[in-house]
Amino acid sequence: MAKLNAYFGEFGGQFVPQILVPALDQLEQAFIDAQQDDAFRAEFMSLLQEYAGRPTALTLTQNITKGTKTKLYLKREDLLHGGAHKTNQVLGQALLAKRMGKHEIIAETGAGQHGVATALACALLGLKCRVYMGAKDVERQSPNVFRMRLMGATVIPVHSGSATLKDACNEALRDWSASYETAHYLLGTAAGPHPFPTIVREFQRIIGEETKNQILAREGRLPDAVIACVGGGSNAIGMFADFIEEESVRLIGIEPAGKGIHTHQHGAPLKHGKTGIFFGMKAPLMQDEHGQVEESYSVSAGLDFPSVGPQHAYLNAIGRAEYESITDDEALDAFQALARNEGIIPALESSHALAHAIKMAYAEPDKEQLLVVNLSGRGDKDIFTVHKLLEDKGAL
């Protein structure tokens, strides 16, 4: 039986209760078979084009890098149906679930974007849907909670632990342990136990594939760097995957520095964590001095995650990708700058990547560079959060 690699260097693996191993084995085999099935690929591509709206645009910014020699393009995943990159891989996994004969879907969500994407895919494909969401995130993201419920999903608030994404992940896995015969766990990021990191990357890699074709058509060359925010890491690995072999292209992932790395209120385990076992995988993890999982923090719910996908850990370890961090305040500035200068309201998550690109442009204004930011989602879900933050700062 063909098998996928369970590890990226030392990272990854499958650290789950024995009861889930058959479900993960079944998923791996179904994915391998589906990837070799032309009819499955055609159905997936048809959904991406006719339902989700691919290909998404590659937009050259007009004003935000004025006074520099940087050309900054945005890969517009914010224009995808559902409002973020999440829709890509959710459609793939939902098709896979149907192929396996599962008729219920379990999901976890932080910002609510994965929950919304899962709910829309389930509505489209006739699957039952239940979404676990940290109670704090239910408060932070009420528009997305209502969207999920409108599309027929059951949203289950999780009050344990920090009542955020990591706790929702734990509850979703617990549910799946008891229901895997009829339910598929539709994991929302390129992390977790094998084979999820590989499956999610493959269903997201269309981001980088399109970007490569579009930038070559527009500029006649590859970009100097592609930049993406990193929480669990699915939008970033989707952007990076097709560029990993292109050694001239820098891969830059941006973790949330939150209120500052020195404050411990951040979500940057790649650069500031220790390797541990969490969420079914071996990966960098925010831990306290006793080795317990430390609470992560970010203004953006979708980056508020104490670990990171194993392929990012590997790309960091071998030096192929660079990982930097951006604070809440810097992300907030970039959020406003894009709205004011380009008429585009980005997700707070994506604003972290944008902030770093703007920094790169103005750090060397005379340097001719071609940058692409993965604008992973739109900011409608964040306008109330941003309004309150600006009000509190007296900046309105």
From Swiss-Prot:
InterPro entries: Trp_synth_b_CS, Trp_synth_beta, Trp_synth_beta/beta-like, TrpB-like_PALP, TrpB-like_PALP_sf. The modification N6-(pyridoxal phosphate)lysine is found at residue 86. GO terms for molecular function: tryptophan synthase activity. GO terms for cellular component: cytoplasm. The keyword Lyase applies. Keywords: Amino-acid biosynthesis, Aromatic amino acid biosynthesis, Lyase, Pyridoxal phosphate, Tryptophan biosynthesis. It comes from the Bacteria. It catalyses: (1S,2R)-1-C-(indol-3-yl)glycerol 3-phosphate + L-serine = D-glyceraldehyde 3-phosphate + L-tryptophan + H2O. Its cofactor is pyridoxal 5'-phosphate. The keyword Cell inner membrane does not apply. One of its GO terms (biological process) is L-tryptophan biosynthetic process. Pathway: Amino-acid biosynthesis; L-tryptophan biosynthesis; L-tryptophan from chorismate: step 5/5. It is an enzyme of class 4 (lyase). The beta subunit is responsible for the synthesis of L-tryptophan from indole and L-serine. Tetramer of two alpha and two beta chains. Belongs to the TrpB family. This is Tryptophan synthase beta chain. It comes from Vibrio cholerae serotype O1 (strain ATCC 39315 / El Tor Inaba N16961). The lineage of its organism: Bacteria, Pseudomonadati, Pseudomonadota, Gammaproteobacteria, Vibrionales.
